[in-house]
Amino acid sequence: MILESAAVIYRGFPKRLHHAVPHWVETRALFHIRMTLDCEKKQRALTQPNLAQALLDSAKFFENKQRWHITLFLLMPDHLHALLSFARDQSMSGIIGDWKRFHARKNRVVWQEGYFDHRLRADERGEQLSAKLNYIRHNPVAAGLCDKPEDWTWIIDPFG
C-alpha cells in the first residue's frame, strides 16, 4: 500500500477517495455525483414509488435550505445521478453524508460507502455539461426502463 495525499492506493486503485473541494475551485462549481445502493444487501429499489418520491422530495428540501443547487437529479433502481453545486462554505461530503444518513435512518436505504464525484470545469461547461445532461437523461432509456427520456418519472430536471 502506498499512501498518497488524495487516496490510499491498493493494487493500483484508490481504496478511498477524499471529497474535499479545493479552495481554488470556483463558487458554485458543478459536480456530477453518483450514489449507489449496497448491492450485497437486500434492497428496495430507489424507484419504488414511495421511496422514490421521498428521495426527490428531500433533494428539493435540501435545495430549498440552500444545502445544494440542483441542475439535474435522476433516480435509477440501484443508483442515482445528480448534477449539483454547493456554496463555497459548505462541505460537499458533509451535505451528501447528511442526505444519505437521513434516508438510511428514515427509509432503511443501505448505500455503498462514499460516492463518485466529478467536477465539471468552468472552461468545459458548455459541451461537457450538454454531454452529461444527455447521458444522465438517457440512462433509463439505455437500461430499458422507458422508451424516451421524457417518459421517466423519477427525475428533477429544472431545465429539461
Regions found by a protein language model. Name each.
Residues M1-G160:
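Short catalytic/metal-binding and nucleic-acid-binding patches
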